[in-house]
Amino acid sequence: MLCFRNITGLAIYPEICYNICVCIIMELSSVQNHLKEVIAMSTNSYESPFCTRYASKEMQYIFSADKKFTTWRKLWVALARAEMKLGLPVTQEQVDELEANVNNIDYDMAAAEEKIVRHDVMAHVHTYGKCCPKADGIIHLGATSCYVGDNTDIIIMRDAMNVVKRKLVKVIDQLANFADKYKGLPCLAYTHLQPAQLTTVGKRATLWCNELLMDLEDLDFQLSRLKLLGSKGTTGTQASFMELFEGDTDKIKELERMIAEEMGFDAVVPVSGQTYSRKVDFAVCQVMAAIAQSAMKFGNDIRLLQSFKEIEEPFEKTQIGSSAMAYKRNPMRDERICSLARYVMCDVLNPAFTAGTQWFERTLDDSANKRISVAEAFLGVDAILNIMLNVTDPDNGLVVYDKIITRRVMAELPFMATENIMMDAVKKGGNRQQLHEKIRQYSMQAGARVKQEGLDNNLCELILADPDFMITKEEMDAIMKPVNFIGRCSQQVDEFIENCVKPVIEANGVSDDVAEINV
């Protein structure tokens, strides 16, 4: 038999080499086929755009199968540990085995089991028991499906709210910095989308920021009142635990306290049916909808300002605005904010109807809807905040065109200044009613000149030429300074940041989150 030597000096025989090569080729072929299946699954079946385009990996994980089912197992561990400490026939060895296998989930086995038993919780009980043979007999002892299902949902919502809070605080901080930077830059203020008076770019930003602060306050409130379901049994009576603990009420209450503490909660709900009240889902999703409202207001304002060429969202060097019109710079980020916000605002109707249709101690018509609506409320808001983090970034975010802003201010300022001009003339002895009528007539003339002839606003020239106003060019120039018409804008911004924003930032800190935008 021929014998060769490889670079390590070991003898390799042709027959063995051949068999090894065949095995490697077969394995590679299997991997290739599996990859083809994965690719096919990603292109010939529906995938949520929240996962493929919009939401962060962090938020996607929170609503993933791994997060859900490992939390189920952690709850089973907490239940077993508490039952052991309270004297039930559960051993430390069994608890240790359960704890060691929290992440050892055979999803194929669980799926096969669910096809047989048509019950997701029991499928996972059996799957967990297979890898924990010593603890198999005590898994889920005294519990009902909602012990793992509902408690996990509460834990997931808590974790998701904390992610939302962290990003929301950073957006608030970035908007406050923007407001401070531009607190003294006069711009047109609008009512009915018509120029009204002046405000400043920074003062307007405080309006966006303040609404987000209101949302943060609501979010903190919902976080503070969030409680675990606990271990209430099939209809909320804890009858199974009364049997297990032979009527010892104190032990049953201690069981819940221990479980809540292990899962990071201060308390469980005082009373329930089989489930926690679905009003909790509605209250939480209502906060998500409120954040979406605030974001939509911000996004719409930026879209309008971009159409005026006053402020633009960031536009990348290689970004294409239109497939036909190469010159376009569309506000696609803010348009996406508004689009996603609309979805989240409508989504809140789902938990509202779900809460209203929970018959007696529970029905199952909440389940399918809840799996979709609660997750998508968070995924949607996460996507919105990611975009807002990008758009409000202090280095590469909103672009302010101060010269355009000033030019548009000066085009309208003559109309806005007429009251001050009239007051000065009255102080010099003029007739208020006659001057008011003259200003009305001159304003109509100047307006027609602008709209019908496309010429500049000449209202100031018309007033200067009328001796009844008794005003000089120097006096007119002094009146026509935009800063004279912004009231307390700068002070309001300073006070808002000092009294409203700074306490929030000091209490929460600012994360180092970087906007995660895929497209």
Q: What do the PLM-derived regions correspond to, one by one?
A:
Residues 35-239, 245-260, 321-322, 332-336, ...:
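A helix-coil-helix interface module used to build multimeric assemblies
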Residues 60-64, 109-111, 319-339, 361-376, ...:
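Short beta-alpha connecting loops at secondary-structure transitions
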Residues 66, 158-169, 176, 202, ...:
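Short amphipathic alpha-helical segments with heptad-repeat character
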Residues 258-273:
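A short, charged helix-loop
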Residues 343-430, 438:
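Long, amphipathic alpha-helical stalk/connector segments used for oligomerization, subunit docking
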Residues 419-470:
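C-terminal hydrophobic structural anchor segments
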